[in-house]
Amino acid sequence: VDIESPIDGSLQKAYFYKTRSSKPQPLIVSLHTWSFDYSQYDSINIQSAEKDLNYIHPDFRGPNKSKDACCSDLVISDIDASIDFAIDNANVDTSKIFIIGNSGGGYATIAMFMRSKHRIKKFSSWVPLVDLLRWYDETKIRKLEYANDILSCTQSVNNILNEDVAKKKSPIYWETPIEKLNYTSLDIYTGVYDGMIGNGPIPITHSINFYNKLLNDIGEKDKTKFVSDKEKLFLLEYRKALGNFDSISGREVFLFKESNNIRLTLFDGGHEILKEFAFQQLIK
C-alpha cells in the first residue's frame, strides 16, 4: 500500500494485512532493521497472518542512511501515519496496538515509545541502539559500515560527526513520556554477547543505559531496580548470569529487571530476536 506523509506529502510504502474477522482484532506494527526497508522479510508477518491479526510493515524513510531517516520527526510521523492507515482500513481493536522491532527496528520501537501520538498497548524492542554519538564511536573503531550511515543520517561533513543532529536522533537524550506508563509497557531484550566481534554491532550498554535512564526519569527510588555499575561491569567482563532467572525460548536469562511497566531482559544470545517468543510475548 501507499501512505501519504502528513508532513511532506511523500508516499510511504508498506506491507499491510487486514483481518478477515468480523470482530475487531489487534494491530501488529513491525518495524524494519537499520539497513533495510518495508520489503524486508519479516517473520512477524507470517505469525500475524496465521492468527489473522492486522499487520503493517511501514517503510519510514527506508534504510538509515539519509538525513530524513534515523528516528527523525519524519520517521515518527510516517510510523504514526501507518497506524492511522491501518485503523482507517481494517477492523482494528484500538485497545490492542502493538509495536515491535529488532536492531534498527528496536531503535525505532523505542523512538515510538518516546514520541508516538497513538495509545499503544505494548512496545517490544530487541537489541536496540539508543545513542548515535556512542554508536558512531563504537562502529568507527570496529570499521563497520554503520559509522558512514550515521554520518549520512546526521548531515555530517568532512567525516566529522554532527553531534547536535546525532543527539536529536538519539532517544536516550529525549524527554520520557512518564504518563504513558499508566497504559503501556516497554520490553527491552538484548543478547548478552551483542557488541562483541562476531556476535553483533550494538553493545549491551545501549539497552542497559536506556533502561536506567527511564527509571531515573520516572523517579524510581529502589536502587535494586536499576542495573548497577557493578552488575554492568560483571556482564561486560564475564557474560554470565547474575542470578537464577527464567529461560526464554530455551535460552538462559542472565539478568532481568523491571519497574513501572518497563522491563529489561538480557539473555544467552547475540544480536537477534527470538521470533516465536517475541510474537507470543507481544500479543499475550
What are these regions (language model features)?
Residues 40, 121-122, 128-129, 133-180, ...:
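Mobile cap/lid helix-loop segments that gate and shape the active-site cleft of serine hydrolases
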Residues 27-31, 54-59, 98-100, 122-127, ...:
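Structural recognition of the beta-strand scaffold that forms the well-ordered cores
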Residues 23-25, 30-68, 196:
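Short substrate-entry loop that stabilizes the transition state in hydrolases
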Residues 169, 179-186, 258-262:
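Short, proline-enriched alpha-helix->beta-strand connector loops that line the catalytic pocket
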Residues 36, 87-89, 94-143:
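Primarily recognizes the serine-hydrolase "nucleophile elbow" in alpha/beta-hydrolase
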Residues 70-90:
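Alpha/beta-hydrolase active-site loop
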Residues 1-22:
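N-terminal cap/lid segment of alpha/beta-hydrolase-fold proteins
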